[in-house]
Every structure is written in C-alpha cells, then in structure tokens.
Amino acid sequence: MSVSENILENASRVFGELRRQAWQKPAARPAHKPANPCQDLAGRHLGNPVAMRADFNMAVSAHRNVVSEFHNCWARRIFAILGAAALCACSAMKLGYQQGDHLAYWWIDNYVDVSTAQEPLTREAIARFFAWHRKAQLPEIASLLQQAKADVRQPVTPATVEHFQDASQQLARKSFEQAMPDLADLLLTLTPEQIGRMEKRFAEGNAKYRKKFLNPDPAEREDARYDKVMDYARLVYGSFSSDQEKAIRARMGPVVQNAEARYAERVARQQEWLRMVRYVHATQPPKAQVMDVLRRFREYWQNPPAKHAASHEASINAGIALTVAIANMTTPQQKAHAQDRFQKWIDDTHALIREKANAPVQSAATN
C-alpha cells in the first residue's frame, strides 16, 4: 500500500492545528469533557481507521512518511500526526510528535465520543504507545530516512520504491501488534451509540472524498489528484519548472483512472471494520479472541479480497511508476534540496529519540 492520500489532503490543516495548540489556549468547555479543537475536522478521512487508500507513492521522495499507512483507532492517528507534520516543515515533525498524544486523543474522541470511564484508559494507552514507539521505531525510522537520503541522489528504480514500501509495511505491522491489546480493550467497551457515531463519521468523510476526488468533471478530478501529487513532490524537491509539471501531469492518467475502484475498496474496508466492531459488541468475546479478529482485519487491508485485488495492485503500480518518473526527472539542484530535507528530518528524529529516552514502556497484553 502506498502513501496514504488522506495524510496529504489534510496536512496543512493539521499543521495549522499543531501551531494553534502551541500558541493558543483552547476555548473553555464543560469540566467533564476535554476541549476538542479538532471537532471542525469531523468526518474527514484522516482519522478514519479504515478509509486509508493510496494511489500515489512518494516512497523515495517522502519515505512514505514511514508509517503513515497504519490502520487502527489509536496508532493510526499517531502516524497521521507524524505524516502531516513531516509534510509541512522539518521543525513541525518534532512539534507534531510532542503534541501527538493530545491530538490522537481528540481524533479518537471525534470518532467515538470517549466516555468518562473510557477516557483515562484511552489516554494511558496512547501514552504507552508513544513511549514504545519512541524507543522501538524512531531509530528504525531514522535509519530508513538515512537510506532515502543516500538513494535520492541516484537513479530511482521500482525496486528502490518497493524496498521502502516493504520496510514501512513491517513498521506498520509491528505497531499494530503493539497497539492491539489496548485497541481490543476499547472495542470491548464501545456502545451502540459510539459505533453509530463512527459510521456517521465514515459517511461524512466519504462524501468529502467523492466531492473532491470523484468529481463528474474529468478535468476537476485530474486537478485534485495532480495537486496532491505536487504537494509531495515540492515538499521534497522544491519548485518544479513548467516543463516538469507538464511532464508529471501527462503521467497522471493511470492514477486518476483507478479512482472509482479505489473508492470502492475504501468503502469495503469501512464496512468490514464496522462488521468487526459490531460483532465484538454483540458477542463480547474474550480479549484474546478480539485480538485474533483484529489480526484478521489487518490481513484484510494488507491483502484485500480477490474482488478488490486487481484494483489494489493497479493503484500500487501506478503510484510506483509515477514516483519513479518524478524522481528521475529532477535536476541536481532538486536532488540536493531533497537531501537537505531528509537530513533535517533525520536530525529531528534523533532529537525525538533523545527526548524522554528513559520513559517507561508498559504493555497492556496482560491487563
């Protein structure tokens, strides 16, 4: 699976929220419920645990945001924060990570309206995940960024892109396993009202997705996808010439043509997630069984069923081809810009590793 399109779509708004959090106090809210500055983001698919779908892979250029494809109700939001921060500015990566626990909680609350009883356990789970991730995965991320910095000066091949895909998939799987016990605990406590709220958020996000990416006007549809691709490309390589932009647009066809199939796969994942959540609510199985169900869902989104497999593979291949084309048309100056960008991300990652290096890491597996 390639870079999550929802991360890029919302990166500027997320970064705006990060800056607002850094400099402003939230509006007063009732004492029993924390302020939620992310409510205006309700319904968008950034926080959707099953809406993630990609059609463009800037694996070498943006390093896939390393873990931006991760799907679940806690860790996925954390990675969304990281991905959005990385897309906006180098220093924002640190800011996003440092405030990620708060934003992750707000996203979860936006989807399920966390109850008073659920709140302390949810916050503890998020803190536990961040402590683990800082120790276990940030060093791996720094290493992969270092590889990307070296590779970006060389001719890029599909194999290069696939290497970063595989590496980020492995990070995602490890993260899912780490968060799974806490996620199982949350699923066992969800009420019918919370599940209904989640379904409503999916529907709202899908409506926004259709409006932007499934516009009846082919030109509008292409423009929306092109803008997304160029946001990634400019972030990493800097500005592009008009000739380069025309060449990139000319290669957009396979990416745009698969839009309907991608949307169908997106909706199917959402429905599979909702079926799983309702099953857990109705049967209240032992925690170990809930974790087994979560693993099956993970396999579903990493290896979609046959009816979606062809479009899934086509999207991946289209993204790889476009990534390779963009990387190989860049000038020495653009490649130097990319190396500088990666180095700043590397520096920020190392700084984050040093922060709270001795933070305790606990597990919820036996809770």
PLM segments and residue spans:
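Bacterial N-terminal signal peptides that target proteins for export
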Residues: V60-F79
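A cross-kingdom marker for long, charged
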Residues: Y105-W106, R266, Q270-N367
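C-terminal motif of bacterial Sec signal peptides marking the signal peptidase cleavage site
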Residues: C88-A89
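N-terminal amphipathic/hydrophobic targeting modules at extreme N-termini
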Residues: S12-F15, P34-Q39, G43, A51-R53, ...
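Extended amphipathic alpha-helical interaction segments
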Residues: P181-P305
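N-terminal Sec/ER secretory leader and immediately downstream segment
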Residues: M93-E193, R197, R201, F342-W345
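Short, low-complexity cationic-aromatic patches
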Residues: Y97, V112-P120, A172-P181, T191, ...
